[in-house]
Amino acid sequence: MPKAEAFTCDCDVIHEDVVNRIRAAMPESQSFYALANLYKMFADNTRVRILWALSREKMCVCDLAVLLNMTKSALSHQLKLLRLANLVTYDRQGKIVYYSLSDDHVKDVFERGFEHIRE
């Protein structure tokens, strides 16, 4: 068998019971679209570095900018995208704005990703 075909079925049998069972449990298309958009947020090195820092503790914009060697303007743009994706939240205390991860789900997804690449 040629290598190109080694990873495909060599038959035309359809396991209808499996197909029907999975089809019945499959979420609607909008859920897949939303999930793909969520994962797009993790597809940018800068945003991943921001999320990593915030997975350690909440930080103000100035500290994040220094840590990541970014301008506050560039950082604010990325934080806005993360905020719109509900990955981070902020708390204004006077003139200082602190950012943190929105919830433990975000940290879990992030840490699972690191576990996966380390295997």
What are these regions (language model features)?
Residues V66, H77, R83-L84:
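Alpha-helical residues within the helix-turn-helix
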Residues S100-E119:
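Conserved segment of winged-helix/HTH DNA-binding domains
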Residues E28, L87, E119:
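Hydrophobic patch in the ABC ATPase nucleotide-binding domain
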Residues R83-Q93, S100:
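Beta-hairpin "wing" of winged helix-turn-helix
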Residues P27-S73, V97-D104:
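N-terminal helix-turn-helix DNA-binding core of bacterial DNA-binding proteins
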Residues M1-F42:
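N-terminal leader segment of winged-helix/HTH proteins
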